[in-house]
Every structure is written in structure tokens, then in C-alpha cells.
Amino acid sequence: MTHDKKNAKIIPFPHLKDRLVEKGMSSLKEKKYQEALELFSEAMKYDDTESDLHLGMAICFLELGELEEAESVCEKMLKEGYGHYFTVLQVYMTILIQLKKYEEVKSTIEAVLEENQLPAESAEQFYKLLDFSRKMTDPDREDEAWAEEYEDTIDTEKVLASPEEQMNLIHSLKDRNVAKYTGLLKTILQDPSAHPIIKTMIVMLLAEHEYSKPVHISKFGESLTIEPSEIVPPDAAPILHRVLRVLDETLGNENPTLYAAVEELWRRHLYVLYPFQPKLLSADLWAAALHKVGYEMHGIEIESEELHMMYEFTDRELDEACTMLKDIEEISYL
């Protein structure tokens, strides 16, 4: 009898793995990274082939500062083809940069470029990472000397003409006095051709430095005057959390994985708009639009009537909101 018990096969509760994944995604959404990691690890015992599990673990490791573990998970995903390749690759590049493995960043992106695999929406971001990694692996480069040289030899015309140079300028000013460059930064903010994300980064930079003078911004054909030190950061915008609360009651309960994806979409949308706010301010409307666009992105159809059962909106405004989400998403990466 003892022998039989010892060798009996343990049968898990039905759908236990799915419940563990859902709880893990919920904890990840709430930024409870250690709790999420433990749930994902437990789910792995039942099925170690699900891409969401691997990516969720990689993100948890990254947020917990366990970079080598995060690196290992991403390498396995890329090698075995788990998940969306370029989503995983972007996370992997982020990890390598934090590990200061610039040579690996350079060689990896160069290999991808040789195969002409980069999707158009990701190309610019990867080219910037490649250029950055090449600079960081330059044998003649010395960190402090390079930073000082950049500051002393800045070419205003070159900066105004190049998003890459604008990014370099912003990063170089993170821990420096911005006073010398506020004129240039303000010029970029009013330049119709400057990328909206660059403008967001400049406003946030000025806010971090508690810059309190009026700043004029042009974005998406609109103009706005703000005092950077007084504005609310995009991740604290009331519309962000009002929409997510509504969406959590519907999509969050129905499909936590998809909820996490559209939450990130909504955060990116507001980040690109910042410091502007959406013209339409109905939380129900934006929750419905995110629900619909999220389904479409994953190849799922949902009828307007079904959305009307969960949210209050007009069809005309829903179409407008969905178009806005898609248009902003197309330019939401540098």
C-alpha cells in the first residue's frame, strides 16, 4: 500500500495551468513581479511551451534586476521560436544594453539586418540601437571624454535635422544642466517635422529638471503652452487609470493576457500624445476602442452589439477612437 502511494501519478486540477497563467498576468499587470514570477514558474511545470509564460518570466526577471536570468529566457525564446520574434528581440536588446553587452547588441542587429527581416515599424528603433552600440564599442571612446566632447561640439543644424542626434542630446542632458540648451529644445518642440516621441521625451526631461517657464508645443496639428514643472506625467494621467479600471472589469476578467497587451497599447498612446490629452474623454468609449483594437490585433472579430453590452458609446465615436489608436500605434516606436 505504501509502495502504491509513493508511485501514484499526481493528476493536476483541471485547467490549473491556465489559472496560474491568468493569476501571473494579473500580478504582472499590478507590478507584483516576484508574485507573478512564482506563478509563472509553477505554471511552467505543466506546460513550458507557452510563449506568454516565457515572455512574462523574462519581464519579471528584468524588473527584478535579475538580468542574467532574463537574458537566458529571451535567448531560449529566440532560439526555439516562442512568441512574436521582434517583441522578444526588443526585450532582449533592452536586457543586453543594461548588461552593457554592446558588442552582442551590435552583432545581433547586424545579423538581422543582413537577412532584411526588420518590419518597417521597428526599423528606426533598431537602427538607433545599432548606432548606439557601435558608439559604445568604439575602442577610442572614453565615457566622460565622449560626453564632454558631444556637449562642446554640438551642431545645432545637425540636431534639428536628425532624430538620432535629438535622442543623443536628450540622453546627454539627463544628469546635466539643461539651461544651455532650452532654446534648442524649444525649437524642436515647435518643429512640425520632429517626431512626437522626441517631443514627449523633451517635455519629460524639462519636467524632471523642474523647468518652470512657459513652453510652446506643436503636435498632431495642435498647439499647447505648458509649464513643464507643473504638468502631470503620462503614467499618472487620470484618463489612463479611468479607462484601465473600466477595461479591467471586462477584458481583464475575460482575457488577462490580452488585457495586458492593450494596457501597454493605451500607455503608449498617451505617451505619444503627451502633454496633450485625448479629445474624447469618455472612459467607456476608450475601453470599447481598446477592446475592439486588441481583438483585431489578435485576429479576433467582435461585433459592435457585443461591445454595446459592456460599454456606453456611439458607433461614430468608436470608429474615430479606433482610428486614433491605430494611427498613433503606427508611430509609437522610434
From Swiss-Prot:
Pfam families: TPR_19. The keyword Repeat applies. Keywords: Repeat, TPR repeat. TPR repeats lie at residues 17-50, 52-84, 195-230. InterPro entries: TPR-like_helical_dom_sf (IPR011990), TPR_rpt (IPR019734). This is TPR repeat-containing protein YsoA. It comes from Bacillus subtilis (strain 168).
